[in-house]
Amino acid sequence: MNIKSLLLGSAAALVAASGAQAADAIVAPEPEAVEYVRVCDAYGAGYFYIPGTETCLRVHGYVRYDVKGGDDVYTGSDRKGWDKGARFALMFNTNSETELGTLGTYTQLRFNYTSNNSRHDGQYGDFSDDRDVADGGVSTGTDLQFAYITLGGFKVGIDESEFHTFTGYLGDVINDDVVAAGSYRTGKIAYTFTGGNGFSAVIALEQGGEDVDNDYTIDGYMPHVVGGLKYAGGWGSIAGAVAYDPVIEEWATKVRGDVNITDRFSVWLQGAYSSAATPNQNYGQWGGDWAVWGGAKFIATEKVTFNLQAAHDDWGKTAVTANVAYQLVPGFTITPEVSYTKFGGEWKDTVAEDNAWGGIVRFQRSF
């Protein structure tokens, strides 16, 4: 055997061995394409598509810490020290388009922690039976604050009453409802018509709400009923709402006007009337037949906004509040606020002191 034959034989053996190994090799499948999260800008900033769907989701919320001192301007009692409270609010919005309009949901979870001054000097202990210190101590709570579905102008679920939301609440101050304007959270079914000329209207059937001392839910099949009309333009808006309370068979109404003096300065005024001259009802919770609120906002700079609100009711309660909202950095706002309440007339017999001065500083990180 010559050298040439030996080389040819070796080459043939190598080719055969390579073919056998190739036949036994495992071929890896092609990797599936990764579906990255897509931004959804159809409903504003912060939305993204839920993978595999055409539904847009937004996750947002805030962390808040309040420090309060002085008097409680709602009750007139002396805090006798610092009251402090924290809240973490987590919110979810979803939206998608259907043949009947935009289908949406909104939910908000609140986790609260309150640590108030004990209201008792020089000692610890359980003072829950002492009315002078009942608001002291530590409390915690978790709430499903909101959970509702929207489709076009239709809304069903847990929300705040249209008696508040449709007209625009009150001012941009923390202690805005010292003169109360009605209960807030409720189960409801509502429909809002929005025209193309600035006109809108609402009708709502509501279950009723509650506050610290009273339950204002309905006592049968007849719901609370709220209706409202609004006209809005570049100059501002005017809105009115009327509500019927079937439990006490009385009604309440209010009208609010907002005017944009400039792009930085705006004012508002709201008047309300109730056929039942008592705060113990679902809607007209001010004292007496009537109440009035008013306020102003001035955007001084991109970081600083001044807010002022005043209110007075038929029974003689007067409340004034002012604050400065300072945006330290984007997403983090510090708001010092000072409030004063004068309890006159029929309110004198319900509070500890006729005059109350209180202060609060709020630290809030929104995301």
Curated annotation (Swiss-Prot):
Subcellular location: Cell outer membrane
UniProt organism field: Brucella suis
Main localization (coarse): membrane
Pfam families registered for this protein in UniProt: Porin_2
Domain notes: Consists of 16-stranded beta-barrel sheets, with large surface-exposed loops, that form a transmembrane pore at the center of each barrel. The pore is partially ocluded by a peptide loop that folds into the pore lumen.
Domain of life the protein comes from: Bacteria
GO terms assigned for molecular function: porin activity
Family: Belongs to the alphaproteobacteria porin family.
Consequence of substituting V304A: In strain: 83-210
Membrane topology, as annotated: Multi-pass membrane protein
Keyword tags: Cell outer membrane, Ion transport, Membrane, Porin, Signal, Transmembrane, Transmembrane beta strand, Transport
Oligomer and partners: Monomer.
Ion transport found in the keyword field: yes
Signal peptide (residue range): 1-22
Misc. comment: The pore formed by Omp2a is larger than the one formed by Omp2b. Omp2b pores have optimal permeability to allow growth and protection against harmful compounds. The larger pore formed by Omp2a may be advantageous for intracellular growth, when the bacterium is competing with the host cell for nutrients whose concentration is particularly low within the phagosome.
Protein name per Swiss-Prot or TrEMBL: Porin Omp2a
UniProt keyword Ribonucleoprotein, yes or no: no
Resulting phenotype, A241V: In strain: 83-210
GO CC annotation: cell outer membrane; pore complex
Alphabetical GO biological process terms: monoatomic ion transport
Function: Forms passive diffusion pores that allow small molecular weight hydrophilic materials across the outer membrane.
